[in-house]
A protein has these predicted regions:
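Helix-to-loop junction immediately C-terminal to a conserved catalytic motif
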Residues: 58
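Conserved ABC transporter NBD signature motif
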Residues: 66-76, 84
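Catalytic Walker B motif of ABC-type/P-loop ATPase nucleotide-binding domains
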Residues: 167-170
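The feature captures the beta-strand-to-loop junction immediately N-terminal to the Walker
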Residues: 43-45
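Conserved ABC ATPase signature
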Residues: 142-146, 150
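Conserved ABC ATPase "signature" region
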Residues: 120-138
């Protein structure tokens, strides 16, 4: 689905004088492969390069060196960009910068009109997109009247309506409250599980990545670590090296283990930890 090979992306950091201006590598020879239908998380501290990488997935940025292939089409070739941007949709941190319609329905239809989708098909896609994000009752609402979570769900509906194979959520939950974050992540998981859409989640919230098929850890423009949540979260010191923390429930499980409770690690979900504690209390679980 997506293959990144030896990707380098630099930007100019301007100083007070021309002599002080330097070139900074935001991405430094990145290699990555993402298969169709996977739920991928890309994590890292601020400035690690994760959002810069995300913008290469649908040709918003172009490689200085290396290649990004989307379904075997290179983002470096202008003729491929239209198809690539139909294949990979993006949702960004601030939905106000992405919503342009006077109503929710009008906003979702914008991309479909640009694709010249017939009216009957367009209406069907809008209906299915609204249903997928649980916003059917807000069809005629003014986006300005919506909550932050509802605006982000509207942006997701618009991105999904064009029938992409891949959806990139670039810090899409960063401005949301915990409840809205859970709703957005839940929708992403459903799109992945029920529709087979490849999800690429860019985030710094560790509790959002526990169900990912694979996690890539970015640090100073390189892929520093990669693996499943179980592989990466078994070692708290690994994430600490990159200024990241374990998910709260995983940290709690480690703390209980250190205090002598025979908790089996790593723990990903509160329900899982509660179940283990109940079994320990009943004497059904020991070290």
């Amino acid at each position: 689905m997506i293959k990144v090979s030896n990707l380098v992306h630099s930007y100019l950091k301007f100083g007070k004088t021309e002599e002080d201006t330097i070139s900074v590598k935001a991405l430094d020879h990145v290699d990555m492969e993402i298969d169709k239908g996977e739920f991928i998380a890309i994590i890292g501290h601020n400035g690690s390069g994760k959002s810069t990488l995300a913008k290469h997935f649908n040709g918003l940025l172009f490689p200085d060196e290396g290649t990004v292939w989307i379904d075997e089409l290179s983002t470096g070739e202008q003729k491929n960009l239209k198809q690539i941007r139909r294949t990979v949709s993006m949702v960004f941190q601030n939905p106000d910068n992405q919503i342009i319609g006077a109503t929710v329905e009008e906003d979702i239809s914008f991309g479909l009109e640009n694709m010249q989708i017939p009216r009957e098909q367009m209406q069907d896609r809008i209906d299915r997109s609204l249903e997928a994000v649980r916003m059917t009752d807000k069809r005629q609402a003014n986006p300005g009247s919506l909550s932050g979570g509802q605006k982000q769900k509207t942006a997701i509906a618009g991105a999904v309506a064009v029938s992409p194979k891949c959806l990139v959520l670039d810090e899409a939950t960063a401005m949301l409250d915990p409840r809205a974050r859970r709703e957005v992540i839940g929708i992403a998981r459903e799109l992945n599980e029920k529709q087979g859409i490849t999800i690429i989640l860019i985030t710094h919230f560790m509790d959002e990545v526990t169900h990912a098929d694979k996690i890539f850890v970015m640090d100073h423009g390189v892929v520093a670590e990669s693996g499943t949540p179980e592989e990466l979260f078994i070692d708290p010191q690994l994430l600490e090296r990159y200024h990241l923390e374990l998910p709260p429930v995983t940290r709690l499980a480690f703390s209980l283990r250190q205090k002598g409770l025979p908790v089996r690690l790593p723990v990903m979900e509160p329900e899982e930890l509660a179940d283990q504690i109940e079994r320990i209390y009943r004497g059904e679980q020991r070290c």
